[in-house]
């Protein structure tokens, strides 16, 4: 018999899975991957059936929230078939997707119909040239059209994600908040994760803390702490007089590890117990050596959780903490 929940050595119960369905993306965001990124051969990527087997095992062990990530998850062929199966799982309290928004104009309504409840959409700039510099793609209008389509599709909540960098887009914080407020969206501001080596900028020089961002917002808006809990690392503040909540993801300035309730599985089937550590369990090898053996998979997950570290040790200097890019991990 297997236990019906996953608990790490520090007593934290794991209820949230971030499941990457592809390492591929139609953008090349400077903080996420290199321009000449080499993607994994397709045979190394988990099949949709294998992805469902992983999700099913986690659900059987008490996971109640699943977020589908990438790369860009919406470029994965036949993704809707996986989402429909997950959307039918009554045990799940939440099925969400993180996307760059490029495919949402066509995909928003089918995603909602498949059972996706919440969307996170990356948006680092409202200025066309700056957006193109961040993403290395001139597709801001396409993303904005996708946001409009998502609003029309009737998701429970839509949240924007903005990575803030000093001297690159920190002057747009208020504009991004206004954009969210006008559309009834939430927004999270993110301190850049030190994953992979970047050449486009110096992370030390572009670091912008969540406290700095919040102070800028409070120059125009009153913020009050929110009790909102989504299962992720954001800490939320309500913009007084609006529907908008502002979140802050602060891996550097406000370590969020103490109540970590999540793990990641990469598109290649690696179980990542912590963003800040390279240790990973190869689930793909197990899945392909013992197809259909759900009990063996659950046992492997339970044993792996004994190795989950207490916290990461991210730094803001140029030392690369983890060698994999965010796109390889699952955003």
From Swiss-Prot:
Stored InterPro entries: Aldolase_TIM, Elp3/MiaA/NifB-like_rSAM, MoaA, MoaA_NifB_PqqE_Fe-S-bd_CS, MoaA_twitch, MoCo_biosynth_MoaA/MoaC, rSAM
How are cofactors bound according to the entry's free-text note? Binds 2 [4Fe-4S] clusters. Binds 1 [4Fe-4S] cluster coordinated with 3 cysteines and an exchangeable S-adenosyl-L-methionine and 1 [4Fe-4S] cluster coordinated with 3 cysteines and the GTP-derived substrate.
Q: Which EC class does it fall in?
A: lyase
Q: What positions does the entry give for S-adenosyl-L-methionine binding? A: 31, 71, 122, 193
**Subunit info?**
Monomer and homodimer.
Family to which this protein belongs: Belongs to the radical SAM superfamily. MoaA family.
Q: What is this protein called?
A: GTP 3',8-cyclase
Organism ancestry: Bacteria, Pseudomonadati, Pseudomonadota, Gammaproteobacteria, Pseudomonadales
């Amino acid at each position: 018999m297997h236990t019906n929940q996953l608990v790490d050595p520090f007593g934290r119960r794991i209820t949230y899975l971030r499941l990457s369905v592809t390492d591929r993306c139609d953008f090349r965001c400077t903080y996420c991957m290199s321009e000449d990124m080499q993607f994994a051969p397709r045979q190394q990527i988990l099949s949709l059936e294998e992805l469902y087997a992983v999700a099913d095992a986690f659900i059987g062990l008490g996971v109640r929230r699943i977020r589908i990530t990438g790369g860009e998850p919406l470029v994965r062929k036949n993704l809707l078939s996986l989402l429909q199966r997950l959307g039918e799982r009554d045990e799940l309290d939440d099925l969400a997707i993180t996307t760059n928004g490029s495919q949402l104009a066509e995909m928003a309504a089918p995603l909602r119909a498949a059972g996706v409840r919440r969307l996170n959409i990356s948006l680092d700039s409202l200025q066309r040239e700056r957006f193109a510099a961040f993403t290395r793609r001139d597709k801001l209008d396409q993303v904005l059209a996708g946001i409009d389509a998502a609003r029309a599709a009737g998701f429970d909540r839509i949240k924007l994600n903005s990575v803030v960098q000093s001297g690159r887009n920190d002057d747009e914080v208020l504009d991004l908040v206004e954009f969210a407020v006008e559309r009834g969206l939430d927004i999270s501001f993110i301190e850049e994760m030190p994953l992979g080596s970047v050449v486009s900028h110096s992370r030390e020089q572009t670091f912008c803390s969540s406290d700095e961002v919040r102070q800028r917002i409070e120059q125009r808006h009153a913020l009050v702490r929110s009790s909102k809990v989504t299962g992720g690392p954001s800490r939320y503040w309500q913009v007084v007089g609006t529907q908008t909540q502002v979140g802050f993801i602060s891996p550097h300035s406000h370590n969020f590890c103490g109540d970590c309730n999540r793990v990641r599985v990469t598109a290649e089937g690696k179980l990542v117990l912590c963003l800040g550590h390279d240790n990973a369990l190869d689930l793909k090898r197990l899945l392909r050596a013992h197809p259909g053996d759900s009990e063996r998979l659950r046992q492997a997950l339970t044993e792996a959780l004994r190795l989950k570290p207490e916290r990461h040790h991210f730094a803001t200097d140029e030392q690369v903490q983890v060698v994999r890019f965010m796109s390889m991990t699952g955003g």
